[in-house]
Structures are given as C-alpha cells and as structure tokens.
Design a protein with these regions (language model features):
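Class I S-adenosyl-L-methionine
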Residues: 1-60, 66, 169-178, 189-298
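Conserved SAM-binding loop
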Residues: 74
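Short alpha-helix immediately C-terminal to the canonical SAM-binding loop
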Residues: 71
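SAM-dependent nucleic-acid methyltransferase catalytic core
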Residues: 2-25, 31, 35, 78-192, ...
C-alpha cells in the first residue's frame, strides 16, 4: 500500500501519556515508513502515538503490548468508551484513591474489565510522569480526556489489539508485505517499564527475531554503544537523530536526547516517491533528502 508524507489530516492525539511515548518523534518515525506495505504491526504499543498519527488506510493494523492492564484499557476504549467515561467521571484526584486503585491492580483483584481499565487510566493520569507508581499531586480534570477517548475509540475500530510477547507476535504476523514498528524498552531503562520481567528485557532476543523476518521493520532506541553493536549487521540501517528531552527541559532549556532509528530497508524511499512533502515546512525535497542521507550510517 502506498503512503504519502503528510501532517495533520487524519492524525489524532493519543488519549494518554506513557513512559517513552513517541509524541515528540512521531513525525520523524512516520516519515521513514516504507513506501509499500499491507500489514502494519505496532509491536510495543504504549500510548500509540505513532498509530494515532498514522492515517488510517486499507492496510491490516495490529496494536500489541505485553502489559495486560494496558491492553484491557485499549479494548475498553474501543468497545465500551461510554461505560469507561462513566467510570472515570467521578474519580477523585487524591493520594488515598490513587493508592487504593494501585493496590487493587497489583493484587490482581477480580474486577470488571471497564472498572479495571478506569483504575489503570486514572493511575496513568494521576501519577508522576505517567509511571503509575507515584502519585503526581498535580491538578487534572479527568473529563478533559473524554474527547480524546472518543477519538481513539473511532480510530481503533478496525485495529486488532493483541497482548503477546514481542517475539511470538513478530513470528505470528510476519509476511513479505508486513511492516513492524518497534519501540521496545530502552537499554538500561528497565526500571521505568511496568511489564518488564525481573530478568530485564531481552534485547538480543528481539534482534534475532527481527533479523529473520520476511517483512520490514523500523525500530526506535536510545543511542548507546550496546545497541549500536547489536545492530551492526549487513543490510541494517542505523540512523542517529535527536529530540528535545522533556524531563531535562526543566533544568536545561533546549537539552537534546539522542536516539536511534534502525531499519532493514532504505528509510528515504517514501520521501523520494513524494511529489509534495508536507511534513517539512521550510525544506524542499532535495534539501530533505540531503539532510537525511547526511546522517545515515550504512
């Protein structure tokens, strides 16, 4: 399926914040999508910033995450948005309620799906940096999120929602026409991700799974020597980029955070195929390609 670069249009915002969310990089990621594919699989879904920014088309779409509470929330947003809003409407932004909801979820108490989703969403919204563990103590009106939930419910109607291990998911959905976008837990950052096992995320296992696929993949990671070494393989493109660091902005204005975009295809192919490039406001097509190629390390 052919894609064109664009900004706005069918794009919507995510209905939630998330640790490592790709709001700041969504344009950069989407600009590097392959030109043709029929299956889009988001392996580490999180807040879904890339999926929600991607224009819906005729391709088969999959959203996956290993976090069962997160997947239940997505399913309730898609299938029971009104019931979810009713549960959320009178939830208090208080430390006492926050600790109660956290205890109920951590103890795996038997809860109706919608209530469990509401508890988890409240933990995300009322926690510090959306980490779900520490009460944020910041004012937040829950009903301000209701339009976002409604928009997300519409966008998710034709999306398959999975709750699988990343390697098993990749093997299940791999086809020559498949495109996998992967935003795994970053290296040496396991402590910030709720559903990572005590042994830590298996970065080497993900490499092995991706190198053997028939389709294409695009991977976002923190820029570090260990990840560069893991993906230093023939046919793999490693591109260094940077974004504003949201947390560091509080202490150092303009602080940049280095990231990597890793793929098994030429990420400039979509830009080369476009007559009009609307993701970029001040550069013509040749300037964009020159700038992109300059930072490629093949």
């Amino acid at each position: 399926m052919r894609r064109r670069l664009r900004k706005g249009g069918d794009s919507i915002n995510s209905f939630m914040a998330w640790v490592g969310g790709k709001k700041a990089l969504r344009d950069e990621v989407l600009a590097r999508f392959p030109r043709n594919y029929k299956r889009y699989i988001e392996v580490f879904g999180g807040a879904g910033w890339v999926l929600f920014h991607k224009p819906p088309g005729n391709d088969f779409e999959v959203f996956n995450d290993f976090n069962g509470n997160l997947v239940n929330l997505y399913r309730c947003v898609r299938e029971q948005p009104e019931a979810l809003r009713d549960e959320l409407r009178y939830m208090l932004n208080s430390r006492l309620d926050f600790e109660y909801m956290k205890q109920m979820l951590h103890s795996k108490a038997v809860l109706p799906d919608v209530r469990r989703a509401a508890y988890y969403y409240a933990l995300i919204r009322y926690s510090y940096a959306a980490g779900t563990s520490s009460f944020g103590g910041q004012p937040h009106a829950m009903w301000n999120n209701f339009p976002l939930i409604e928009s997300a419910a519409g966008r998710l109607q034709k999306v398959v929602i999975e709750n699988k291990d990343c390697v098993k998911l990749i093997r299940q959905y791999d086809r020559p026409e498949s495109f996998f976008y992967c935003d795994p837990p970053y290296y040496n950052a396991d402590q910030y991700y709720e559903a990572v096992s005590e042994d830590g995320f298996d970065h080497a296992g993900l490499v092995d799974a991706l190198l053997g696929i028939k389709g294409k993949f695009l991977l976002s990671y923190n820029d570090c020597p260990e990840i560069r070494a893991l993906y230093d393989r023939p046919g793999i493109v490693v591109e260094g980029i940077s974004r504003l660091s949201n947390i560091a902005q509080r202490y150092e204005n303009g602080k940049q955070y280095p990231e990597l975009l890793i793929s098994n295809y030429d990420t400039t192919e979509l830009a080369r195929s476009c007559v009009q490039l609307t993701l970029f406001d001040r550069l013509d097509s040749q300037e964009i390609l020159n700038e992109r190629i300059l930072y490629h390390e093949i």
